[in-house]
């Protein structure tokens, strides 16, 4: 709550501690200096800043939420609010719940500006963050083609879970349904030809709680199994009603790990771009923001690619001219909300993304990275 009585929203980060009952009342404080320092990623960010007992206000980007929390807590802050630097809300989580020290959440860019003004004026604000953390068990569902060359394994995946707040039709039921269709198509004779590769279809659990299912899958692969896994294709939110046609950006650096996609990822991106073009549509490289199941494969050095329809980010005017829809509005206005239901998703978007995915999956089911259009035989 601000001094004028307004109550801008805060999205609590996954695994964040809660504020005390009744909330936390304190002055917000921002790290001074350049853009890098305002991200609050390095211990020196708060040098000369009276952060003890205050609410740290930092910009998104530059490091993980864990790092932002650790640095702010080390400076004596009582909580951290991370302001988006673009349109939309901030939906985040902590990668290491055991290391969580102080409450942390995300706010929109506009709310960040309001809080910065409160800090400049020396006024206090009240922040209330409530979270529940429990230990639970979930499962991945893995389907493996009975035939195909195991020395050249192609993995495709989509997460099955949703956030507690919504039924998760676009995030991520539509993608899981398309993945299932791919598996059913592969079941009809795949593996009977000598050029066929082994196909694995991963329906991941606990993506919304830190990409846990896909990370577990990669972590439990033997060294030999990792070597055999030649590429990964990811499907995420492909039915967004105000959709974009995005491919995973093979030239981007992961904002948390600093890793770049493995060699071969650019070819996968190009194949997906060509598959959209074959439908008369232009795709664009999407945000490689570390928020989907490709991350575990990227971290293991496995070439990655994928399709994505957009979530809470706002569609630009240029994108609206390219794909239609409403500029300045989220790709999915029901992201992580109760309205994420079957009536909301775009069948057109699901078809475009699904066809592009199936085209590329079919190609790599019989080809290796770097091969042309002629199957091995």
Named regions from a protein language model:
Residues 1-6, 204-311, 315:
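Metal-dependent peptidase/peptidase-like ectodomains
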Residues 13-109, 167, 171, 184, ...:
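Extracellular/luminal Protease-associated
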Residues 16-40, 96-169, 181-184, 189, ...:
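Soluble metallo-hydrolase cores and metallopeptidase-like ectodomains found primarily
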Residues 34-36, 61-64, 85-89, 111-112, ...:
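Solvent-exposed loop/turn segments at secondary-structure junctions
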Residues 54-59, 78-83, 103-106, 141-144, ...:
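Structural recognition of the beta-strand scaffold that forms the well-ordered cores
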Residues 62-67, 74, 102, 106-110, ...:
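Soluble non-cytosolic domains of exported or imported proteins
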Residues 97-99, 185-212, 232-235, 370:
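Short helix-loop-beta-strand segments that form the rim/entrance of peptidase-like active sites
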Residues 314-377:
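His/Asp/Glu-rich mid-to-C-terminal helical/loop segments that flank catalytic regions of hydrolases
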């Amino acid at each position: 709550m601000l001094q004028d009585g307004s109550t801008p929203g805060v999205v609590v980060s996954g695994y964040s501690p809660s504020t005390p009952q009744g909330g936390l009342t304190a002055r917000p404080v921002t790290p001074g200096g350049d853009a890098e320092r305002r991200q609050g990623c390095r211990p020196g960010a708060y040098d000369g800043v009276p952060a003890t007992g205050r609410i740290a206000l930092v910009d998104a980007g530059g490091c993980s939420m864990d790092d932002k929390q650790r640095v702010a807590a080390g400076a004596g802050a009582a909580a951290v609010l991370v302001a988006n630097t673009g349109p939309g809300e901030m939906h985040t989580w902590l990668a290491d719940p055991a290391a969580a020290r102080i409450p942390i959440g995300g706010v929109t860019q506009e709310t960040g500006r309001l809080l910065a003004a409160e800090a400049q004026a020396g006024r206090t604000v009240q922040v209330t963050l409530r979270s529940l953390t429990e230990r639970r068990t979930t499962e991945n569902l893995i389907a493996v083609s009975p035939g195909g060359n195991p020395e050249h394994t192609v993995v495709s995946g989509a997460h099955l879970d949703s956030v507690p707040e919504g039924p998760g039709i676009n995030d991520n039921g539509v993608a899981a349904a398309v993945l299932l269709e791919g598996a059913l198509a592969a079941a009809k004779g795949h593996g009977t030809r000598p050029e066929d590769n082994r196909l694995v279809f991963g329906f991941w659990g606990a993506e919304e709680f830190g990409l846990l299912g896909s990370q577990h899958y990669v972590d439990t692969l033997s060294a030999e199994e990792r070597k055999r896994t030649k590429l990964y294709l990811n499907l995420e939110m492909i039915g967004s009603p105000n959709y974009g046609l995005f491919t995973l950006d093979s030239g981007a650096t992961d904002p948390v790990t600093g890793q770049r996609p493995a060699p071969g990822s650019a070819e996968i991106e190009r194949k997906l771009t060509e598959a959209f073009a074959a439908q008369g549509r232009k795709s664009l490289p999407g945000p490689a923001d570390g928020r989907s199941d490709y991350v575990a494969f990227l971290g293991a050095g496995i070439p990655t690619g994928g399709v994505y329809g957009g979530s809470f980010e706002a569609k630009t005017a240029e994108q609206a001219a390219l794909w239609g829809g409403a500029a300045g509005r989220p790709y999915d206005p029901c992201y992580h909300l109760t309205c994420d239901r079957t009536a909301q998703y775009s069948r057109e978007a699901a078809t475009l993304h699904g066809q592009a995915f199936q085209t590329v999956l079919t190609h790599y089911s019989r080809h290796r990275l770097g091969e042309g259009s002629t199957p091995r035989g």
